[in-house]
Amino acid sequence: MNITDIKKYIPHRYPFLLIDRVIKIEKDKSLVAIKNVTVNEPFFTGHFPVRPVMPGVLIIESLAQAAGILIVKSLNLPEGHKDIYFFAGVDNARFKRVVEPGDQLTLEVKVLKVHRGLWKFEGKATVDDQLACKAELMTIKG
């Protein structure tokens, strides 16, 4: 799924669209996506000028956007739908390496549980197969 298709399923836009491509989807189960991190990202202007590092909260947001696409595809919502899923919680977040300009972030989300509209995911972000971040994410329809 390319960027044009991604924009049909989630409402995020520049500068807050943090997924470039979806490379694998298993409805109701998992999704793998990528984010190409470039020096032109607006957040690098202030985080940090001497050594640009992608903010951890934006890595978490990237995982949440991947989860959002998985929800939409799992529920068979049509392109251009108006549903928005919001964070309901983030648990057990850990950051293991920095993400810098030039890195390609691989984002993997797996459905752990769906109950009464609350979706719980396991998220993992890696660079060159090295763990950058992991967290459990919860989302609910807004």
From Swiss-Prot:
UniProt cross-references to InterPro entries, sorted A to Z: FabA_FabZ, FabZ, HotDog_dom_sf
By its UniProt entry, which Pfam families does this protein fall under?
FabA
MF GO annotations = (3R)-hydroxyacyl-[acyl-carrier-protein] dehydratase activity
The source's superkingdom equals: Bacteria
For this entry, list what GO says about its biological process.
fatty acid biosynthetic process; lipid A biosynthetic process
Instruction: Extract the NCBIfam families matched here.
Output: fabZ, PRK00006.1
The UniProt entry's GO CC annotations, sorted and at most eight, read:
cytoplasm; membrane
Keyword Lipid biosynthesis carried by entry = yes
Keyword entries, A-Z? Cytoplasm, Lipid A biosynthesis, Lipid biosynthesis, Lipid metabolism, Lyase
By sequence similarity, the record places it as follows:
Belongs to the thioester dehydratase family. FabZ subfamily.
Described by its record, this protein's role is as follows: Involved in unsaturated fatty acids biosynthesis. Catalyzes the dehydration of short chain beta-hydroxyacyl-ACPs and long chain saturated and unsaturated beta-hydroxyacyl-ACPs.
Q: Where does this polypeptide localize?
A: Cytoplasm
Q: Which gene encodes it?
A: fabZ
What protein name is recorded for this chain?
A: 3-hydroxyacyl-[acyl-carrier-protein] dehydratase FabZ
The catalytic activity, as recorded, is: a (3R)-hydroxyacyl-[ACP] = a (2E)-enoyl-[ACP] + H2O
Q: What Gene3D superfamilies does the record tag this protein with?
A: Hotdog Thioesterase
* Active site residues per record: H47
**What HAMAP family does its record include?**
FabZ (MF_00406)
Give the EC number(s) under which this enzyme is classified: 4.2.1.59
